[in-house]
Structure formats: structure tokens, C-alpha cells
Amino acid sequence: MGSFSIWHWLIVLVIVALIFGTKKLRNIGSDLGGAVKGFKDGMQEANADKTEQVTQQQTTIDVQAKEKQNS
């Protein structure tokens, strides 16, 4: 009684399809898919920026030190 079976979910799906219509549900699905894709692309760009910053910080510069002459 506490959990929903597959039949409960199918009835809910049919009711939602009748209320909103399949075209509206398709639009909602494509909008949701676009949002997920945008989120994934943003995460990949953030990871690429992090690795770029790490490689820039790890560069070494070789220099020679000179003694300062006091006059």
C-alpha cells in the first residue's frame, strides 16, 4: 500500500497525457533535454578551464640571480 506499482505509474502517465496533450509534453521533453545538454556543456567547459589554469600555474621560469653591488 505504501509503494506505487507499475500500474499506478501508467495511470498517472495516461492522465497527464490527457491533460497536457502529447505535443506539449514533447515540447517540455525537448526543453528539458536542451537544459541538461547545456548543463553538461557548461560542466565540461569549467573542467577545461580548471586544467588550463593548472597547466599555466605549473610552468617554471629559469633565471640567474645576480649579486647586488652596494656603493
From Swiss-Prot:
It is found in: Cell inner membrane. One of its GO terms (molecular function) is protein transmembrane transporter activity. GO terms for biological process: protein transport by the Tat complex. One of its GO terms (cellular component) is TAT protein transport complex. It is a single-pass membrane protein. Pfam families: TatA_B_E (PF02416). InterPro entries: TatA/B/E, TatA/E. Residues 48-71 are annotated as: Disordered. The chain crosses the membrane at residues 1-21. It comes from the Bacteria. Keywords: Cell inner membrane, Cell membrane, Membrane, Protein transport, Translocation, Transmembrane, Transmembrane helix, Transport. NCBIfam families: PRK02958.1, tatAE. Part of the twin-arginine translocation (Tat) system that transports large folded proteins containing a characteristic twin-arginine motif in their signal peptide across membranes. TatA could form the protein-conducting channel of the Tat system. Belongs to the TatA/E family. The Tat system comprises two distinct complexes: a TatABC complex, containing multiple copies of TatA, TatB and TatC subunits, and a separate TatA complex, containing only TatA subunits. Substrates initially bind to the TatABC complex, which probably triggers association of the separate TatA complex to form the active translocon. PANTHER family: SEC-INDEPENDENT PROTEIN TRANSLOCASE PROTEIN TATA. This is Sec-independent protein translocase protein TatA. The gene is tatA.
